[in-house]
C-alpha cells in the first residue's frame, strides 16, 4: 500500500496464527499452525505501508483515530511458559468481548475494561545487521528508535506516536494487538 502524508488508512491487523486461533482450538492445532511457517517470528504484523516522499531524516507522525475490536480475543501461551504455567496449563484461552460496553468477562464475577492498543508499531529499519536480525530479517521482539514491540498502553485511540524515518517510504508495520 502506498499513501501520501496526511492520508487516513484503515488497517485490519491479522491476529496471531493468521486468524486461525479461535475459540475451541486445541494445543495440537496451535502447534501445527505455529510450525507451518519456517523461521516464524513471535508476532504477526501487517504492513509495510509506504509513505510517498518520506525519506531518512524525516519524522513520521502516526495518529490512531480509532481501534475497533473483534467479537472475541485469545490469549496464547507457549506450552510451559508464561507467568503461571502450572496454574494455567492451557495454551489458548478465548474471551468474548462486549465491544459496546468495551469490557470482557474474565470470570463470572470479574469484568475487565478494554483499552485496545497495538503491541507492535514500527517503521522500517536501516540497520538490519544487529543481534535481533538474521540475513536482513529482523525480529519484532526488540524495540528501538524504529518502534517495534513496545506494548505501550498509552498508544490508544487519539494518540500520536513519532518515529524517525530510516528508509525511503518509512514502511509502517503494526500488529500484536492488545486490549488491556
What spans do the regions from the language model cover?
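Alpha/propeptide regions of enzymes that mature by internal proteolysis
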Residues: 1-10, 44-63, 92, 126, ...
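N-terminal, Lys/Arg-enriched amphipathic/low-complexity engagement segments
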Residues: 1-37
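DUTPase catalytic domain/fold
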Residues: 3-4, 9-11, 17, 57, ...
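Short, Lys/Arg- and Gly-enriched loop/turn segments at beta-strand edges
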Residues: 16-27, 67-77, 169-179
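Aromatic/His-enriched, Gly/Pro-containing loop or helix-boundary segments
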Residues: 30-52
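Short, glycine/acidic-rich beta->alpha junctions
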Residues: 41-46, 142-147, 180
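Intrinsically disordered, low-complexity linker/loop segments enriched in Gly/Pro
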Residues: 66-156
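Extended, low-polarity segments enriched in aliphatic/aromatic residues
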Residues: 152-156, 160-180
Amino acid at each position: 500500500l502506498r499513501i501520501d502524508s496526511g492520508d487516513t488508512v484503515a488497517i485490519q491487523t491479522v491476529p496471531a496464527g493468521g486468524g486461525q486461533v479461535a475459540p475451541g482450538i486445541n494445543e495440537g492445532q496451535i502447534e501445527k499452525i505455529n510450525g507451518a511457517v519456517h523461521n516464524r517470528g513471535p508476532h504477526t504484523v501487517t504492513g509495510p505501508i509506504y509513505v510517498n516522499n518520506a525519506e531518512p531524516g524525516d519524522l513520521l507522525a502516526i495518529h490512531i483515530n480509532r481501534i475497533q475490536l473483534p467479537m472475541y480475543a485469545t490469549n496464547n501461551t507457549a506450552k510451559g511458559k508464561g507467568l503461571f504455567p502450572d496454574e494455567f496449563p492451557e495454551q489458548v484461552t478465548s474471551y468474548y468481548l462486549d465491544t459496546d460496553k468495551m469490557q470482557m468477562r474474565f470470570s463470572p464475577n470479574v469484568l475487565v475494561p478494554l483499552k485496545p492498543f497495538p503491541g507492535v508499531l514500527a517503521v522500517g529499519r536501516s540497520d538490519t545487521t544487529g543481534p535481533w536480525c538474521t540475513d536482513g530479517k529482523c525480529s519484532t521482539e526488540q524495540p528501538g528508535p524504529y518502534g517495534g514491540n513496545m506494548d505501550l498502553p498509552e498508544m490508544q485511540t487519539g494518540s500520536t506516536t513519532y518515529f524517525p524515518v530510516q528508509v525511503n517510504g518509512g514502511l509502517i508495520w503494526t500488529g500484536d494487538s492488545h486490549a488491556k
